[in-house]
């Protein structure tokens, strides 16, 4: 059973114009939306997130899974700037895994003070 069957409300993320990857508390990828599959060059569902990252990234991911925290940063890859938001996801206050949202950024990014 895939996560969309378990959580029918997740269906709205399937065609969202940002990459969404979700893993369980052991780092097993349990969901990728269409954009994440495209950005990662294939469906990694069933693979372990720790096999896809370097040791520094794995350390950060483990920390997020232990503390329930978040990590926000930008990268540039092949000339494309991306914002990455990683956050532990919880159920009834208990950490269940990690969610990563990847957004391709336009140049320049408007910044407003409100």
Regions found by a protein language model. Give the residues of each.
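Sensory/regulatory domains in signal-transduction proteins
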Residues: 26, 31, 35-114
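Sensory modules in modular signal-transduction proteins
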Residues: 1-34
């Amino acid at each position: 059973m895939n996560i969309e069957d378990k959580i029918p409300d997740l269906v709205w993320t399937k065609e969202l114009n940002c990459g969404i990857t979700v893993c369980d508390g052991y780092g097993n990828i349990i969901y990728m939306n269409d954009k994440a599959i495209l950005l990662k060059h294939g469906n990694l569902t069933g693979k372990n997130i720790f096999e896809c990252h370097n040791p520094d990234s794995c350390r950060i991911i483990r920390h997020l899974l232990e503390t329930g925290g978040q990590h926000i940063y930008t990268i540039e890859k092949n000339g494309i700037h991306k914002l990455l938001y990683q956050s532990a996801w919880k159920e009834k206050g208990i950490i269940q895994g990690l969610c990563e949202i990847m957004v391709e950024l336009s140049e320049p990014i408007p910044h407003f003070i409100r």
